[in-house]
A protein has these predicted regions:
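Rossmann-fold scaffold of SDR-type NAD(P)-dependent oxidoreductases
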Residues: 11, 67-72, 113, 222
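Conserved beta-loop-beta element that borders a ligand/cofactor-binding pocket
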Residues: 115, 138-162, 187, 242
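N-terminal Rossmann NAD(P)H-binding glycine-rich loop of SDR-like oxidoreductase domains
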Residues: 8-28
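Conserved Rossmann-fold NAD(P)-dependent oxidoreductase catalytic core, especially the SDR/UDP-sugar
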Residues: 71, 90, 94-129, 151
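Flexible, glycine-rich beta-alpha linker
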Residues: 119-127, 154-171
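C-terminal substrate-binding subdomain of Rossmann-fold SDR/epimerase-dehydratase oxidoreductases
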Residues: 181-306
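Active-site helix of classical SDR
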Residues: 131-134
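NAD(P)H-binding glycine-rich loop region in Rossmannoid oxidoreductase-like domains
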Residues: 57-91, 118, 122
Length: 306
């Protein structure tokens, strides 16, 4: 990345995307302070050049000199925001305001903030995307009035290792994996024709590291594959039973990265098919080992005269 060691703050650094970013930064020899209350993300990277503040972003007080902030902490998911609009908007806006003000006072030269690909699609249709659009308005104010250099990172249905796998925080890919693992049918809301621009976490992180080394950093950084896939096609790749349920309101029909900053190496359909093949092999091996243990136990009893 660079021969110079920098000091980074990563809010939400225990989450899915955040933990991968922290890991990548440390692998490049950088120092990282993670601010995360660990209510959602639980992953900690155990290396000497990472320190943790287990506090709410809005109340944390970082100590030290920092070169850049990655503000990834947020209340995620459109569906969650429908049941708690006040909490979503308040948390997402307040945390961004606090971090932006800290960056202004500390004169931190680089500020990267996570936004949502849905922010460009009817951003007043749900509390989550509304909160993200408010965050951008706030950062633009800080740029014009106080000279804060910020860059918006747009994520497009990120999947891969460490993806959230519980409740409404679960990604679509992980939710389908869990159904296969528990031998339950895949649940599709509506017709399954909705399209999403699924992007592997490794492609996303490679794009962020590339951004850090670039002299000309765009204001809007779209970290998507540029190849949207329908939910139905994704489900079919799992080669598993499917059930349809009533559609959920407030979600876009198509989310596409029209101007990708990265050249995605991973393809979600190929990824899913490989995962399913590996899962089937592991299940067969598990069953074989289970049967062998039964046979060994039976012969052990015979040898002992029982």
């Amino acid at each position: 990345m660079t021969d110079k060691i920098h000091n980074f703050i990563v809010t939400g650094g225990c989450g899915f995307i955040g933990s991968h970013l922290v890991e990548a930064l440390t692998m490049h020899g950088q120092n990282v302070l993670v601010i995360d209350d660990m209510r959602v993300g639980k992953v900690k990277i155990d290396t000497a050049n990472v320190k943790y503040l287990h506090q709410d972003v809005a109340s944390a007080i970082p100590v030290g000199k920092f070169d850049a902030i990655f503000h990834l902490a947020a209340t995620p998911r459109i569906r969650l925001s429908q049941t708690d609009p006040f909490g979503t908007i308040t948390n997402n806006f307040n945390s961004t305001m606090v971090v932006a003000e800290y960056a202004r006072r500390a004169r931190i030269p680089l500020f990267f903030a996570a936004s949502s690909s849905t922010r460009f699609l009817h951003h007043h249709d749900n509390p989550y995307t509304f909160s993200k659009s408010m965050n951008e308005e706030l950062l633009e104010l800080y740029r014009k009035r106080f000279g804060l250099e910020y860059h918006m990172l747009y994520f497009y249905n990120v999947y891969g290792p460490r993806e959230a796998d519980y409740g409404e925080h679960s990604t679509v890919v992980r939710a389908f994996k869990k159904c296969v693992e528990s031998d339950q049918p895949l649940r599709i809301f509506g017709s399954g024709k909705k399209e999403r621009d699924f992007t592997h976490i490794h492609d996303v992180i490679d794009g962020i590291i590339q951004l850090l080394t670039s002299k000309n950093k765009p204001k809007h950084v779209h970290l998507g594959s540029g190849n949207p896939v329908s939910i139905m096609d994704l489900a079919k790749a799992f080669d598993h039973s499917i059930v349809h349920e009533f559609d959920k309101k407030g979600e876009a029909e198509v989310t596409e990265c029209a101007d990708p900053y990265i050249e995605a190496e991973y393809d979600v359909i190929s990824y899913v098919k490989k995962w399913k093949s590996d899962f089937e092999e592991e299940r067969i091996l598990h069953n074989v080992n289970k049967d062998l243990r039964k046979v060994e136990k039976k012969y052990a009893k015979t040898d002992s005269g029982q």
